[in-house]
């Protein structure tokens, strides 16, 4: 990596909705900066599920090293916590080797767990939440943010004064448990923001993105997606498994079982993928540190942003 010696390990995050073009750009970045890709996709962790997860092809994986792909069988339980425990050491090791990690994928919770950690939430006190909501209505979010800064300055520093939901939630944690939210995170073994991350999210206008999604589903079918699903069922992976209930796989399973027509399965697959893309965008928009880049400008703009980050930091 270029630049001086950062106080924290550096990571490039490349995220965005499904079908936006993350894989191509991630590989280009890794090649240009001598980096390696760490996948952040909740479905690409599974073996034998290649076409329906839009997993990088063997040829693409041969161009640069990939991590966190094909690390579990479809009948294994896999969570954001397990992902973070596996991916964090990889990010650390790559930094120690002087290799730039490119954390690329569309599963926002996995990215968050890896970069910032997760902590076990206590059961929220509904009465406290309702009272804090009323106070936010009467006094404004900024006033509650000032209160949070007194009892939990670490969390307050990470939350924008206008982010009412997170302010109220953090205050509720403190009032209900006597321990700040930052204390809960530390108590459960997660360091506070151990990485210096440049977060880049690719976006496209809705019409173009949805067109790409529909086309990609057609390509998956042409590449043998139905055969892939039939092969998983033949291996003994039950339709009820969490992995088999994901988008695409549940639709093809329903068709193969005779429950719906092929036409309906394909249309539902496209529709649910579009809905998922919309939810992904909503998730990423909630991150104030995200740098948004039009996908059409990605190959030119993103390398510039990375060079600036490596030289000067954020």
From Swiss-Prot:
It comes from Desulfosudis oleivorans (strain DSM 6200 / JCM 39069 / Hxd3). Catalyzes the transfer of a dimethylallyl group onto the adenine at position 37 in tRNAs that read codons beginning with uridine, leading to the formation of N6-(dimethylallyl)adenosine (i(6)A). The keyword Nucleotide-binding applies. Residues 41-44 are annotated as: Interaction with substrate tRNA. GO terms for molecular function: ATP binding; tRNA dimethylallyltransferase activity. ATP binds at residues 16-23. This is tRNA dimethylallyltransferase. Belongs to the IPP transferase family. One of its GO terms (biological process) is tRNA modification. Substrate binds at residues 18-23. Pfam families: IPPT. It is an enzyme of class 2 (transferase). The record marks 107 as: Interaction with substrate tRNA. The keyword tRNA processing applies. HAMAP family: IPP_trans. Monomer. Its cofactor is Mg(2+). It catalyses: adenosine(37) in tRNA + dimethylallyl diphosphate = N(6)-dimethylallyladenosine(37) in tRNA + diphosphate. Keywords: ATP-binding, Magnesium, Nucleotide-binding, Transferase, tRNA processing. Its EC number is 2.5.1.75.
């Amino acid at each position: 990596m270029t630049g001086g010696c950062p106080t924290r390990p550096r990571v490039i995050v490349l995220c965005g909705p499904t079908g936006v073009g993350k894989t191509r750009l991630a590989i280009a970045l890794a090649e240009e900066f001598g980096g390696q890709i760490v996948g952040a996709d909740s479905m690409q962790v599974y073996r034998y599920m290649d076409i329906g997860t839009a997993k990088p092809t063997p040829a693409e994986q041969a161009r640069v090293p990939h991590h966190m792909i094909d690390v579990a069988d479809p009948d294994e339980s896999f969570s954001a916590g397990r992902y973070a425990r596996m991916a964090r050491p990889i990010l650390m090791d790559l930094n120690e080797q002087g290799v730039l990690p490119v954390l690329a994928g569309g599963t926002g919770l996995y990215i968050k767990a890896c970069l910032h950690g997760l902590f076990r939430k206590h059961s929220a006190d509904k009465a406290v939440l309702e009272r804090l909501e009323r106070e936010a209505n009467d006094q404004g979010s900024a006033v509650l943010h000032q209160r949070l800064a007194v009892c939990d300055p670490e969390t307050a520093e990470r939350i924008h004064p206008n982010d009412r939901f997170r302010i109220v939630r953090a205050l509720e944690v403190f009032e209900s448990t006597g321990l700040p939210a930052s204390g809960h995170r530390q108590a459960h073994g997660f360091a506070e923001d151990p990485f210096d991350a440049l977060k880049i999210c690719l976006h496209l206008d809705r019409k173009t993105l949805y067109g790409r999604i529909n086309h990609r589903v057609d390509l998956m079918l042409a590449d043998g997606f139905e055969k892939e699903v039939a092969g998983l069922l033949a291996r003994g992976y039950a339709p009820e498994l969490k992995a088999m209930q994901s988008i695409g796989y549940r639709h093809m399973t329903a068709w193969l079982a005779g429950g719906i027509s092929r036409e309906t399965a394909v249309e539902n697959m496209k529709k649910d993928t579009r809905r998922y893309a919309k939810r992904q965008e909503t998730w990423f928009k909630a991150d104030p540190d995200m740098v948004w880049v039009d996908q059409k400008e990605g190959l030119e703009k993103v390398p510039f942003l990375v060079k600036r980050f490596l030289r000067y930091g954020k």
